[in-house]
Amino acid sequence: MSSAVPLNVGITRSADSGASRADGEKRVLLAEPRGYCAGVDRAVETVEKALEKHGAPIYVRKEIVHNRHVVETLSDQGVVFVDETDEVPEGALLVFSAHGVSPAVHESAAARNLRTIDATCPLVTKVHQEAKRFARDDFDILLIGHEGHEEVEGTAGEAPDHVQLVDGPDSVDAVTVRDESKVIWLSQTTLSVDETMQTVARLRERFPSLQDPPSDDICYATQNRQVAVKAMAPECDLVIVVGSRNSSNSVRLVEVALGAGAKASYLVDYAREVDPAWLDGVRTVGITSGASVPEILVRGVIDLLDEHGFHDVQPVTTANETLVFALPRELRAART
């Protein structure tokens, strides 16, 4: 399933780098695609439609998506975010976040007679299904991801006796398997593609028969946003990534920007967090945003840069995204 069409990047290249542009000639390179992915759009709309249908309060386990603005906005509308199901009144409505949950969480919700709506991203659900399938076939599953991330906890919970977490290349040496002929790697959907491939290469050095997942686990949106940043970063004195610090894919965009040649890169939730000192001597600023970031926050950064003389905004388009996910079954009639 392809959701992206490669396009001409179309950056007007400077002679050497953004810093060599003529004095006073400032520009913004605006990464496209950026912001909401199909899974985040579905999750946020799920909560909004649930509010319309059932009224406040409704409960959401963890953050529906990892974005401060989204969570605060929904909280103001009557959504109550909780860490665990035992914080939800018996019989209440609980929405599971886009990151997915383990079978144990589903069982806990059922034990409290909670009405549930599952907003798990379908691409995360795909990884869950892969974990269950390979556990049934008695494989050792090496799950590449970040310890403590909700998505990793949910996926590992599908087959706890078969899954080992591999948190980056430096964790590879600690991995042990029962049968080197029955080992497969899966991954969190929001990782750096490059770092994940480094981890896989290290794993394959130890386990030559390591199998790849049936299809890419790192989601199309994560990959597309990283590709766009790589395209513009060599031209940038500064790359501003709009996103929250607990957003894995947003943090990865900062790392990708620096690795691809940007002289500096910072993560901000809001335009007001941009330090004017970052702009000293800067001629080219790149802007992108994580997959859980509403476009209004990006526009705020563009407006701020305009006040500092960055009037020329050039899109850097590397893909067009067209994928849309259906709402959860309980809410499909409510979609407009």
UniProtKB/Swiss-Prot annotation:
Binds 1 [4Fe-4S] cluster per subunit. [4Fe-4S] cluster binds at residues 37, 121, 219. Isopentenyl diphosphate binds at residues 66, 99, 149, 247-249, 292. InterPro entries: LytB/IspH. GO terms for biological process: dimethylallyl diphosphate biosynthetic process; isopentenyl diphosphate biosynthetic process, methylerythritol 4-phosphate pathway; terpenoid biosynthetic process. Its cofactor is [4Fe-4S] cluster. It catalyses: isopentenyl diphosphate + 2 oxidized [2Fe-2S]-[ferredoxin] + H2O = (2E)-4-hydroxy-3-methylbut-2-enyl diphosphate + 2 reduced [2Fe-2S]-[ferredoxin] + 2 H(+); dimethylallyl diphosphate + 2 oxidized [2Fe-2S]-[ferredoxin] + H2O = (2E)-4-hydroxy-3-methylbut-2-enyl diphosphate + 2 reduced [2Fe-2S]-[ferredoxin] + 2 H(+). Pathway: Isoprenoid biosynthesis; dimethylallyl diphosphate biosynthesis; dimethylallyl diphosphate from (2E)-4-hydroxy-3-methylbutenyl diphosphate: step 1/1; Isoprenoid biosynthesis; isopentenyl diphosphate biosynthesis via DXP pathway; isopentenyl diphosphate from 1-deoxy-D-xylulose 5-phosphate: step 6/6. Keywords: 4Fe-4S, Iron, Iron-sulfur, Isoprene biosynthesis, Metal-binding, Oxidoreductase. GO terms for molecular function: 4 iron, 4 sulfur cluster binding; 4-hydroxy-3-methylbut-2-enyl diphosphate reductase activity; metal ion binding. Dimethylallyl diphosphate binds at residues 66, 99, 149, 247-249, 292. It is an enzyme of class 1 (oxidoreductase). The active site is at 151 (proton donor). Its EC number is 1.17.7.4. Pfam families: LYTB. It comes from the Bacteria. (2E)-4-hydroxy-3-methylbut-2-enyl diphosphate binds at residues 66, 99, 149, 189, 247-249, 292. Catalyzes the conversion of 1-hydroxy-2-methyl-2-(E)-butenyl 4-diphosphate (HMBPP) into a mixture of isopentenyl diphosphate (IPP) and dimethylallyl diphosphate (DMAPP). Acts in the terminal step of the DOXP/MEP pathway for isoprenoid precursor biosynthesis. Belongs to the IspH family. NCBIfam families: ispH_lytB, PRK01045.1-2, PRK01045.1-3, PRK01045.1-4. This is 4-hydroxy-3-methylbut-2-enyl diphosphate reductase. It comes from Rhodococcus opacus (strain B4). The gene is ispH.
